[in-house]
């Protein structure tokens, strides 16, 4: 058990998480979402406290199935993944993630054998930290993973895309129309973001489903019709005659500026 981490977390922040103000916890610029996957409540609590107080948004999952579902629904920026999960091995979770996303994954495990580390890294992990761990070291590795993830996903084009009907700020994850912010659900944003990042290009239906919903949804094409209709109602001047969110019959979808 990682008593050093737990004791440090509870001593520094004893049951005071709700007292931390938004101004104290918010980072400058877009917030970073971290998915913590671990079935040990004390580890999860320590990570939640230490990450939240530094401005990270934290979501948690106690099983492999819950982790894959959370990743598909919430699109975290980084995943901290334990290998010893109750329903499946963490390597299986890693394989599931790598089937559709390249988000940075830091393995946090009690397995110390070099063979376990090699297996995880070969399966697509970006880093490997063993338990018990020092919080300062983990935070440094997390910052490095965030930097690598940002560099990998950086688009050489302007991250602000302006159309005649609405504006999409990819870096800030915001959409405005007629000067007002448009509220999008996480799934709506995920679909719009992928289309905008591939603007002018056809995005296939299976590719879009895998990226936004996850690999197990690759045949659920009706999801695309429903969510594209919602996006058109929110963003297009004339949803029945869209100019920017276009359907390529039988193939996929295209974003046109």
Where are these regions (language model features)?
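Conserved acidic segment of CheY-like receiver
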Residues: 30-42, 47-51, 79
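Short, Lys/Arg-enriched segments at the junction into DNA-binding effector domains
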Residues: 30-33, 144-202, 206
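The short loop immediately C-terminal to the conserved phospho-acceptor aspartate in CheY-like receiver
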Residues: 40, 57, 83-84, 111
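Short hydrophobic/Thr-rich beta-strand motif most characteristic of the beta2 strand and flanking loop
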Residues: 55-62, 70
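Acidic catalytic/metal-coordinating carboxylates
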Residues: 62-66, 89-92
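Active-site beta3 strand of CheY-like receiver
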Residues: 74-80, 85
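Basic, amphipathic DNA-recognition helix from helix-turn-helix-like DNA-binding domains
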Residues: 89, 95, 99, 104-161
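Positively charged, aromatic-enriched patches within helix-turn-helix-type DNA-binding elements
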Residues: 174, 179-186, 190-244, 249-251
């Amino acid at each position: 058990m990682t008593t050093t981490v737990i004791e440090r977390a509870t001593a520094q922040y004893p049951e005071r998480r709700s007292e931390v103000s938004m101004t104290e916890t918010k980072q400058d610029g877009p917030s970073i979402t971290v998915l913590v996957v671990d079935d040990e409540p004390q580890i999860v609590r320590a990570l939640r406290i230490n990450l939240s107080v530094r401005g990270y948004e934290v979501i948690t999952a106690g099983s492999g199935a819950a982790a894959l579902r959370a990743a598909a629904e919430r699109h975290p920026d980084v995943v901290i993944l334990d290998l010893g999960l109750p329903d499946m091995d963490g390597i299986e979770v890693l394989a599931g993630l790598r089937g559709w996303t390249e988000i940075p994954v830091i393995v946090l495990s009690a397995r110390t054998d070099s063979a376990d580390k090699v297996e995880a890294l070969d399966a697509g992990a970006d880093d490997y930290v063993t338990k018990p761990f020092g919080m300062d070291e983990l935070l440094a590795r997390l910052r490095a993973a965030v930097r690598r993830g940002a560099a990998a996903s950086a688009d050489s084009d302007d991250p602000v895309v302006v159309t005649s009907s609405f504006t999409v700020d990819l870096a800030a994850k915001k959409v405005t129309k007629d000067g007002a912010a448009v509220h999008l659900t996480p799934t709506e944003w995920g679909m719009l973001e992928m289309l905008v990042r591939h603007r002018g290009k056809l995005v296939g239906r299976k590719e879009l489903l895998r990226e936004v919903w996850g690999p197990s949804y690759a045949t659920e094409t009706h999801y695309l019709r429903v969510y594209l209709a919602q996006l058109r109602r929110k963003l297009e001047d004339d949803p029945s005659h869209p100019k920017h969110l276009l359907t390529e019959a039988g193939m996929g979808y295209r974003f046109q500026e």
